[in-house]
Design a protein with these regions (language model features):
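Short cationic amphipathic helices and targeting signals
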Residues: 16-23, 89-98
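Short amphipathic alpha-helices in soluble, non-transmembrane regions
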Residues: 33-37, 104-112
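Short, well-structured hydrophobic secondary-structure segments
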Residues: 26-66
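Terminal, regulation- and interaction-focused segments at domain boundaries
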Residues: 6-27
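Acidic, serine/threonine-rich, charge-biased low-complexity segments
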Residues: 42-45, 49-53, 68-71, 75, ...
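Conserved short beta-strand edge segments in small beta-sheet-based binding/regulatory domains
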Residues: 44, 80-86, 115-124
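Long, continuous compositionally biased terminal/linker segments
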Residues: 2, 53-90, 98
Length: 174
């Protein structure tokens, strides 16, 4: 059997830093520890589903033109999203360019988190395209869902104001 070529160039993800994390911490504890150490606000979103297995997904954006952070579980019970050597439990993704100093500081901070055995930057020639594309799709779905919810909230607020105005008009005419 011919071995698979695990090298895929990730041209569209050049500004993404991919950190492999080995940790026995459960997802929410790891996210909380990373939040505390890096002053982030990673929040749990809908799981990424591959081959029927849910893999936890955490998301945080520091605002427009800033970094976007994701924490993705690579293990769900007996399923593995992507096998890596050495074994990884999570991917921590940082979108948008980081200065070398900022990357060093983030890596130092991650390695100081109690419960993280190893954290290292993965080379972009690893077989990451599928997971990065899936995460990008998931983010877009979240943005669309949030926008739709904001639109619904705006409509509700307008309706509430119109109802208040109608009540006030009825009170004046009485």
């Amino acid at each position: 059997m011919k071995p698979k070529n695990n090298k895929i160039q990730i041209a569209s993800f050049d500004d993404t830093t991919v950190v492999g994390i080995n940790s026995a911490l459960v997802d929410y504890k790891l996210a909380c520890s990373i939040n505390n150490k890096l002053s982030l606000d990673l929040a749990r979103y809908d799981d990424l589903v591959f081959e029927g297995a849910p893999f936890s997904f955490f998301y945080y954006t520091a605002g427009e033109n800033y970094n976007v952070y994701n924490l993705v579980s690579l293990v769900c019970k007996d399923k593995v999203l992507f096998p890596f050597k050495p074994r990884l439990d999570y991917l921590f993704l940082i979108q948008n360019t980081l200065s070398p100093e900022r990357q060093i500081n983030i890596m130092r901070s991650l390695r100081e988190v109690e419960g993280i055995a190893h954290a290292f930057v993965l080379e972009k020639d690893k077989n990451l395209r599928q997971v990065l594309e899936t995460i990008a799709d998931c983010e877009q779905q979240m943005i669309n869902k949030k926008k739709k919810q904001n639109d619904i909230n705006t409509i509700r607020e307008k309706m509430r104001k119109q109802e208040e105005e109608l009540v006030a008009l009825r009170a004046q005419s009485s």
